[in-house]
């Protein structure tokens, strides 16, 4: 098996000499500029682990929106007049009175509730007998 190397050119001058094919991607101007920019960033120490510019801009915008929203909420609380604050307090008090906190019995297991109901039934039947 003959090795195709530079020596084949020397002994046969009638052969067509191959030309190196151009890579269309590397030949494009934009690819060369991109490659040049990547090399410069690498030399300056800007790593590839950094986020893309679009992602950084979107995160920055989201962060600014959250900060703005929180500031608006705080400003709205500060701007409440004393009358509105008192109305809010009264509304909360009325809600507490209308919806009293559930008794501890409501959180008791089912068998305890049934047992208490049975006691009431037995006491009611004994009272009915007494009548």
UniProtKB/Swiss-Prot annotation:
GO cellular component, one term: glutamatergic synapse
Recorded superkingdom: Eukaryota
Subcellular location: Nucleus; Cytoplasm, Cytoskeleton, Stress fiber; Cell junction, Focal adhesion; Cell projection, Ruffle membrane
Key words of the record: Actin-binding, Cell cycle, Cell junction, Cell membrane, Cell projection, Coiled coil, Cytoplasm, Cytoskeleton, Growth regulation, Membrane, Nucleus, Stress response, Synapse
Molecular function per GO: actin binding
Keyword Heme belongs to the record: no
Classification via InterPro entries: FAM107 (IPR009533)
Coiled-coil segments on the chain, per record: 57-77
Location of the motif Nuclear localization signal: 61-71
Pfam families: DUF1151
GO biological process terms on file: actin filament bundle assembly; actin filament polymerization; cellular response to glucocorticoid stimulus; cellular response to nutrient levels; cognition; negative regulation of focal adhesion assembly; negative regulation of G1/S transition of mitotic cell cycle; negative regulation of long-term synaptic potentiation
Annotated function: Stress-inducible actin-binding protein that plays a role in synaptic and cognitive functions by modulating actin filamentous (F-actin) dynamics. Mediates polymerization of globular actin to F-actin. Also binds to, stabilizes and bundles F-actin. Involved in synaptic function by regulating neurite outgrowth in an actin-dependent manner and for the acquisition of hippocampus-dependent cognitive function, such as learning and long-term memory.
Complex formation: Interacts with ACTB. Interacts with COMMD1; this interaction stabilizes COMMD1 in the nucleus. Interacts with MAP1A. Interacts with PRDX1. Interacts with F-actin.
Descriptive protein name: Actin-associated protein FAM107A
Annotated source species: Rattus norvegicus
